[in-house]
């Protein structure tokens, strides 16, 4: 289908994931400009329209068709029981490249040691449905109350326990809370409306976006190295390189020399480059990688 006048409506998560999501899209090649107090970012792609909305509501609006595609957590898809297409797992969060956890917490001084100890107790959380399913699975009858935020401050006066999301655990420790159990691990997902997914033009646009976003995630923490080396040093150099993939070796005009190119973890480079130099490599060149497509 001709793409003239076609637009893909994209929902971006507002709040804690906003900055890391905008940065990820930039690395993938989509550059947004977000003005202060505006919910409508501009983008350097005439076939995209973007709106900022809370991740908690994203799956619901994607299901309704208000957005063709959006980014939200696995947790909110489950919590809202949204019927959407889960296009891709994008494992990143506001502070790291790893999943977040929804955990059952109590005050450090609490006698609660397992979920069974919460029979008849009061639990505060943003994920009421997820928590109720967890309690039912464990045969526990407790009161679950929706929390509008600042959930960590509620125990012990306003709740006996909470179910809260954590990435590093620092906020829980700061509020003297102890983790009793992990209820759910969650990561960001690219999701699509079912009707949009069945539209050939929109599906191709969404699949291309997913490929580039996954490529950007895959490239994080990696760099490329190029170098020249005499053929006599190849075996020694290959033994040094902790390659994520087999190096590319190309012939040079000078018959006894080759060019090597390899992708490595950025953490290894400061140790690796001097070793490569001592092994006989010359003209070593390090470069950043924005996307790494498998």
Swiss-Prot record:
Its EC number is 2.4.2.17. Its cofactor is Mg(2+). Feedback inhibited by histidine. Pathway: Amino-acid biosynthesis; L-histidine biosynthesis; L-histidine from 5-phospho-alpha-D-ribose 1-diphosphate: step 1/9. One of its GO terms (cellular component) is cytoplasm. One of its GO terms (biological process) is L-histidine biosynthetic process. One of its GO terms (molecular function) is magnesium ion binding. It is found in: Cytoplasm. It holds the Pfam family HisG. It comes from the Bacteria. Catalyzes the condensation of ATP and 5-phosphoribose 1-diphosphate to form N'-(5'-phosphoribosyl)-ATP (PR-ATP). Has a crucial role in the pathway because the rate of histidine biosynthesis seems to be controlled primarily by regulation of HisG enzymatic activity. PANTHER family: ATP PHOSPHORIBOSYLTRANSFERASE, ATP PHOSPHORIBOSYLTRANSFERASE ATP-PRTASE. HAMAP family: HisG_Long. This is ATP phosphoribosyltransferase. It comes from Pelodictyon phaeoclathratiforme (strain DSM 5477 / BU-1). The gene is hisG.
């Amino acid at each position: 289908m001709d793409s003239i006048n076609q637009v893909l409506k994209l929902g971006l998560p507002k709040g804690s994931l906003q900055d890391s999501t905008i940065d990820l899209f930039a690395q993938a090649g989509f550059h947004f400009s977000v003005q202060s107090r505006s919910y409508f970012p501009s983008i350097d792609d005439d076939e995209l329209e973007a709106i900022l909305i809370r991740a908690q509501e994203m799956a619901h609006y994607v299901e309704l068709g208000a957005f063709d595609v959006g980014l939200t957590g696995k947790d909110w898809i489950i919590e809202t029981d949204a019927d959407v297409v889960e296009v891709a797992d994008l494992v990143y969060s506001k502070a790291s490249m790893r999943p977040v956890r929804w955990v059952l917490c109590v005050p450090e001084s609490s006698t609660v040691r397992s979920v069974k100890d919460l029979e008849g107790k009061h639990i505060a959380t943003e994920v009421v449905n997820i928590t109720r399913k967890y309690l039912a699975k464990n045969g526990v009858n407790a009161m679950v109350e929706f929390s509008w935020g600042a959930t960590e401050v509620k125990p012990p006066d306003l709740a006996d326990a909470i179910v809260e999301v954590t990435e590093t655990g620092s906020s829980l420790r700061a509020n003297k809370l102890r983790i009793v159990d992990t209820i759910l691990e969650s990561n960001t997902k690219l999701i699509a409306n079912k009707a949009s997914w069945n539209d050939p033009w929109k599906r191709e646009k969404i699949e291309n976006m997913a490929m580039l976003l996954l490529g950007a995630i895959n490239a994080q923490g990696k760099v490329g190295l190029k170098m020249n080396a005499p053929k006599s040093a190849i075996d020694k150099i290959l033994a040094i390189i902790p390659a994520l993939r087999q190096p590319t070796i190309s012939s040079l005009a000078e018959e006894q020399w080759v060019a090597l190119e390899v992708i490595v973890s950025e953490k290894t480079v400061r140790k690796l480059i001097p070793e490569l130099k001592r092994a006989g490599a010359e003209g070593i060149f390090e470069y950043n990688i924005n996307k790494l497509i498998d």
